[in-house]
Amino acid sequence: MNEEEKYLFDLRGYLSIENALSECQIRNLNNIWDKHIQDQCAMHETTHRFGQLLGWGQAYVDLIDNPSITPYLEVIIGKQFRLDHIYADLIRAGTSPIGAKLHGGGTPFDPCQFYQFHNGKMFNGLTVVAYNLADVGPEDGGFGCVPGSHKSNVDFPAEWKDMAEVMHPCISKVFGPAGTAVIFTEALTHGALPWTGDGERRTIFFKYSPNSISWSPTYFDENNFKGLTENQRSILEPPNARPPNRKTRPKRESD
């Protein structure tokens, strides 16, 4: 993460990284997704949220520590970040699975979703990596946010939140070709603009937290997944302080 990128993330609360996925990765991820659409998504559904992605195959497991993204997370969150939760959203037309309302923001303070900057270093709570598996054009809809709102000291006006019919001028559209990753802090006021593109919007969301924090009420069990690297197992740990002299991984009190 270079100095220009640090400046932009501090200024706006997000970065857009093109080519975060290779053409081969995009193809493999989409091929797997197609199979799950057939199994889980009815033809008439305009939107659908998929979970349990780490069970979809190695192509999804590899995103745990994507080398194109990890260096950014190490600066934005810290070297001992953990995977908090993941899902994938399909939108064929209209609003997302959770609608078109903006959420998040610097105020009121949320100990799980925050942005701070001290002594030349940024500190973030829950942080999102959103991968485009299909092209998103400037007029298609998709990710929208209020740049700089992660540092706001005033509540976002309630009457500006709903983007279903009108988009307030303070909201920016963030778009990019397939393979683009948008990295943003959950302290940023953001949401999904109604989808009007010709094809489907396919977005994978990998959400990370500092090692000692959890936003999600559930944790990954690293033992449920085969073939994980040692680094991936570490990223799937439940929240804990990770003292440097520990002799074992976290375990339940009854173990």
Stretches with model-predicted labels:
Residues 181, 188-189, 193-255:
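Non-heme Fe(II)/2-oxoglutarate
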Residues 86-88, 129-131, 204-208:
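A structural signal for short, well-ordered beta-strand segments
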Residues 123-126, 135-193, 213:
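Double-stranded beta-helix
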Residues 102-114, 158-168, 219-223:
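Short, surface-exposed loop/helix-turn segments at secondary-structure junctions
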Residues 1-120:
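Non-heme Fe(II)-dependent double-stranded beta-helix
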Residues 88-95, 106-107, 132-138, 149-152:
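Short acidic/polar capping segments at secondary-structure boundaries
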Residues 99-107, 146, 189-192, 206:
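Histidine-centered catalytic micro-motifs
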Residues 104, 133, 185-186, 208:
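Residues immediately flanking
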